[in-house]
């Protein structure tokens, strides 16, 4: 039985084809980096909204731009994405087995480079936006934010009904491809690699030497520049390369930090964490920073600060502790991403509905 399993796991279509463990590990690397950076930006934005609130509001776009620079840098210099290069892999143009292989240091051909960039950067961005849209529409539908006569109601309800099945089909497509890869029936573990016209292979010793040689040459050589246009082009190229190199260095260090966090929060360390965090709840502050003269704060505790009417569907903001009508605060937070009273960065997920005994 073990012999049969070993045969299956080593049944590669190509000799330099990486194992399923390597390709899954490199796939999960960038997947782990995004939420980690998002959490860091969230903490900074909550601690100083004036300086870091912009980065929280536009996190997806900023991350996509930096990811684009990073992936372009690696694809054009190592024929691999950042995570693939981190695990010693490279992208090989499909159908080039009969021809001399292009060295990894030469980068991918332009057509395959842009296809790879689109699937590595643009597609994840669109997927994140689609998931946020589905989550937002689901919450609006659950609490009937839209009026019954809304023309969009039928459309977004159809979208909400179809989205889980489309997502399931998408994930099933990837799972099927991975199973075929494990059984040696496919040379791509991901359908996106096939669409990009490339496959993954391991870096050879010659590839590693050539990449290191090219990096050392780039730092030493300075080509004579003739025109102002060439100077600007070279300066932009160096700036982009410097940003990408800084990102790659920071991410390389961050990867080890993420692995440490993964170990820290593993099941083996749960008892240690509980013993450290099982501290008594501190008493409430004697004096709260409460400005009774604020025009937004009503005199009666049952009045919503936004609509100035008796609250309906009491909802508290976890970021500030103030209570509003659900409809009022939902629309405000969705538009401004902040608490109406304190201005603290706030998302729809911070809304907590209250159910009093009187209701």
UniProtKB/Swiss-Prot annotation:
The keyword Membrane applies. It comes from the Eukaryota. It is a multi-pass membrane protein. Keywords: Membrane, Metal-binding, Peroxisome, Protein transport, Transmembrane, Transmembrane helix, Transport, Ubl conjugation pathway, Zinc, Zinc-finger. One of its GO terms (cellular component) is peroxisomal importomer complex. The keyword Ribosomal protein does not apply. Its main location: membrane. InterPro entries: PEX12, Pex_N, Znf_RING/FYVE/PHD. Pathway: Protein modification; protein ubiquitination. Residues 48-51, 140-144, 278-359 are cytoplasmic. Pfam families: Pex2_Pex12 (PF04757). GO terms for molecular function: ubiquitin-protein transferase activity; zinc ion binding. The chain crosses the membrane at residues 20-47, 52-76, 110-139, 145-183, 250-277. Residues 1-19, 77-109, 184-249 are peroxisomal matrix. Gene3D superfamilies: Zinc/RING finger domain, C3HC4 (zinc finger). Component of a retrotranslocation channel required for peroxisome organization by mediating export of the PEX5 receptor from peroxisomes to the cytosol, thereby promoting PEX5 recycling. The retrotranslocation channel is composed of PEX2, PEX10 and PEX12; each subunit contributing transmembrane segments that coassemble into an open channel that specifically allows the passage of PEX5 through the peroxisomal membrane. PEX12 also regulates PEX5 recycling by activating the E3 ubiquitin-protein ligase activity of PEX10. The three subunits of the retrotranslocation channel (PEX2, PEX10 and PEX12) coassemble in the membrane into a channel with an open 10 Angstrom pore. The RING-type zinc-fingers that catalyze PEX5 receptor ubiquitination are positioned above the pore on the cytosolic side of the complex. The RING-type zinc-finger is degenerated and only coordinates one zinc ions, preventing E3 ubiquitin-protein ligase activity. Belongs to the pex2/pex10/pex12 family. Component of the PEX2-PEX10-PEX12 retrotranslocation channel, composed of PEX2, PEX10 and PEX12. Interacts with PEX19 via its cytoplasmic domain. This is Peroxisome assembly protein 12. It comes from Cricetulus longicaudatus. The gene is PEX12.
């Amino acid at each position: 039985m073990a012999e049969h399993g070993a045969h299956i796991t080593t049944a590669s279509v190509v000799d330099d084809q990486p194992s399923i463990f390597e390709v899954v590990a490199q796939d999960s690397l960038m997947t782990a980096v995004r939420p980690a950076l998002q959490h860091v930006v969230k903490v900074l934005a909550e601690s100083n909204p004036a300086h870091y609130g912009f980065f929280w509001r536009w996190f997806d776009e900023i991350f996509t731009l930096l990811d684009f620079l990073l992936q372009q840098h690696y694809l054009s210099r190592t024929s691999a994405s950042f995570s693939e290069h981190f695990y010693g892999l490279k992208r090989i143009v499909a159908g080039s087995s009969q021809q001399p292989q292009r060295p990894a240091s030469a980068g991918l051909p332009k057509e395959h480079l842009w296809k790879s960039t689109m699937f590595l950067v643009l597609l994840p961005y669109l997927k994140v936006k689609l998931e946020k849209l589905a989550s937002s529409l689901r919450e609006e539908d659950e609490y009937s934010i839209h009026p019954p006569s809304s023309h969009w109601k039928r459309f977004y309800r159809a979208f909400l009904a179809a989205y889980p099945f489309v997502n399931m089909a998408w994930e099933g497509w990837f799972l099927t491809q991975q199973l075929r890869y494990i059984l040696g029936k496919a040379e791509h573990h991901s359908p996106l690699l096939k669409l990009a016209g490339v496959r993954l292979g391991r870096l050879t010793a010659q590839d590693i030497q050539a990449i290191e040689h090219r990096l050392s040459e780039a730092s030493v050589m300075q080509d004579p520049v003739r025109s102002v246009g060439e100077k600007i082009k070279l300066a932009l190229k160096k700036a982009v390369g410097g940003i990408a190199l800084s990102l790659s260095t920071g991410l390389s260090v961050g990867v080890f930090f993420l692995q440490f966090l993964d170990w820290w929060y593993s099941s083996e360390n749960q008892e240690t964490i509980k013993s450290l965090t099982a501290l008594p709840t501190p008493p409430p502050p004697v004096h709260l920073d409460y400005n009774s003269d604020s025009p937004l704060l009503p005199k009666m505790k049952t009045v919503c600060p936004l609509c100035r009417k008796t609250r309906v569907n009491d909802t508290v903001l976890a970021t500030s502790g103030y209570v509003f009508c659900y409809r009022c605060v939902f629309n405000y937070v969705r538009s401004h991403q902040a608490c109406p009273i304190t201005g603290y960065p706030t998302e729809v997920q911070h809304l907590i509905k209250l159910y009093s005994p009187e209701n």
